[in-house]
Amino acid sequence: MALAFSQSQPQARRPFGTVDYVEGSVSITRANRVLGETNFGDEVFPDDMIKTENDGLVIIKLDRTTGMNGDLTVRSGSSIYLRFEPHATSPRSTIEVITGQIGSKVSRLAGSPTLQVRNESTVMGVRGTEFGFVTAPTGSVLVYCTEGNVACSSDDVNLNIPAGQGAEQVPGQRLRLLPVAISNARDFENRWFSDQIEAFRANAPRALADFARRYEQLHSEFYTAFEPFQSSEILARWMQEDRSGAALGSPNSPALMRDKREMITHIARLRRNLFIFERIYLRIDQLADIILGTAIENQEIRPGLTAGAFLRRVRSDAPALTRHVSLYRYAETLYAIRNEGRLPTDMSDDDFFGSSDF
């Protein structure tokens, strides 16, 4: 991932886009804080997190620096991150979908820009098309195209999805083309999502038991890594420098190289965990809306733990987790500022964890 920052003096970044329409509850998190009410005309930037509540929706008009003309729709119940890697002729924009659904209609302005949409299991490449990308709380993914075509990949499966077609990936199964034509995209999306929820309800206690096992393990691993990260003197100093707008000097100075080497150890440990954990706890929060208040919440998912008790515990953990994840994302940005706008490798690269590029 690359960010447009100077090492000697912070510079204003170009926006990823501008809010063109908003309704309901929509929040933007930037530099470790949630901004005020989201309004028409607000700019959004690379590394922002955009979250829509169950009544929320936001449409973002893409900035010309992305190399794309068009808009991005973030539907209700969604959490996404915006990523951007600048290049004179082939800038790359990435929408990292944590939960929820997005849609977009884009075309290239000039050169060879790309727009990529991804979650933990599926990557979709776009150059000029109209598409939808939907995740269910169960972890299933639906990708469909209504104009042009999109390339979609997962593990060793690569598919080309033409207009009027879709593909899905269910946890534990391979990405596959759906054997149906899509005439009304929104109706198809809603039916697919409802089918996923009904399948979950049919086996909710067992599914929630698996969520609980994974949540508890990842929660413990996260805080084991987070405590030394949070107490880092280097992180505190970087945050103070950011608040004061201090000049940062050479990215290759011995002192800064030592700082970066220590911080990337913390960042790498947390990233390994959050790549899955952030999605898990946000999906559990979505499932709570489905289960709480129904008879399922009284069923045990393991001896002594009911579905309702587990879901309420996760919801009570969520505010602190949200703050701590935001601090981690802020640290990523502070690192990149001090590393010529780059993390050790682009965050979408498969070889990140093996990199020694500081």
Regions found by a protein language model. Give the residues of each.
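Hydrophobic h-region of N-terminal signal peptides that target proteins for export
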Residues: M1-S6
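Flexible, surface-exposed loop/linker segments and immediately adjacent secondary-structure boundaries
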Residues: Q7-L57, K61-G249, S253-L256, L287, ...
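Long, low-complexity or tandemly repetitive, helically biased scaffold regions used
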Residues: E216, S220-F358
